[in-house]
Amino acid sequence: MRSLLTSTLKTSFTAFLVFVGVFTHAQSGYSFKFNEQELRNKSNLAIEVPDGNYTVKIRLGNADRSTLTTVRAESSRLLLNNIVTQKGEFKTFKFTVNKRDKFITPDETVQLKTRELDKKNWDKYLSLAFDGEQAGVHSIEIKPNKKAITVFLCGNSTVVDQDSEPWAAWGQVIPAFFNEKVSIANYAESGESSNTFLNAKRFEKALTFMKKGDYVFIEFGHNDEKQRGEDKGAYKHFIKSLKVYI
């Protein structure tokens, strides 16, 4: 049996809450999005919010049965893995999720690849997925967090949020190792090299959110070395691009 226990969405200018029950329609300007096929395998909550970091306070457990719950965000970004509660036991966790869309300005966007067009990393929703043979969510509280340290990941397939199992990369797993004071913003995409990442305006989009105290992790190389031609390759184009990042 797979179930997600949520119902009424209460909103304010600073937070919104989801309580025990069943899903309801949007209130106060927030909207839900559900995929019928996905709901057969896991429960999904998608809430339309502006770009930014959001701290999620989630209480797992159930009064009538034991639970086993894994929580992911956006394109399968791991936050909580196989959390067990016994009958009548509840556990509370906090984590911070980075949400973004493809727009840099109203007239300028990140140049996404075709396979990215339907990815949750680039839509207008903050998406959470709850999975497990006995998944149980008692309540969810979501608040904007403008003080969180953001770690921006720039890279290729070894870093990207892989939304199709069994593929995975370290960039989508590392969020599980941080508390709510840190948010991982994974801009990586399969096939990218140091220069194509820049050309697609991925880094330009990230720059619109960077603030003092944030971090940028850059991992490129194996796609750069495949490039051929003057001023290309791991020892030329890569070095040139690296100077741009720095």
List the model feature ranges, each with a label.
Residues M1-S28:
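Bacterial Sec-dependent N-terminal signal peptides
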Residues Q27-A46:
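Glycan-recognition and processing domains
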Residues L60, D64-L80:
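Short, surface-exposed beta-strand/strand-loop-strand elements in extracellular ectodomains
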Residues D64, S157-D161, E189-T196, H222-Q227:
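Solvent-exposed loop/turn segments at secondary-structure junctions
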Residues I83-K91:
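Short proline/glycine- and polar residue-rich coil/turn motifs
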Residues L128, G132-A188, F203-V216:
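Serine-esterase "nucleophile elbow" of acetyl-processing enzymes
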Residues K201-I246:
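Alpha-helical cap/lid subdomain in secreted, periplasmic
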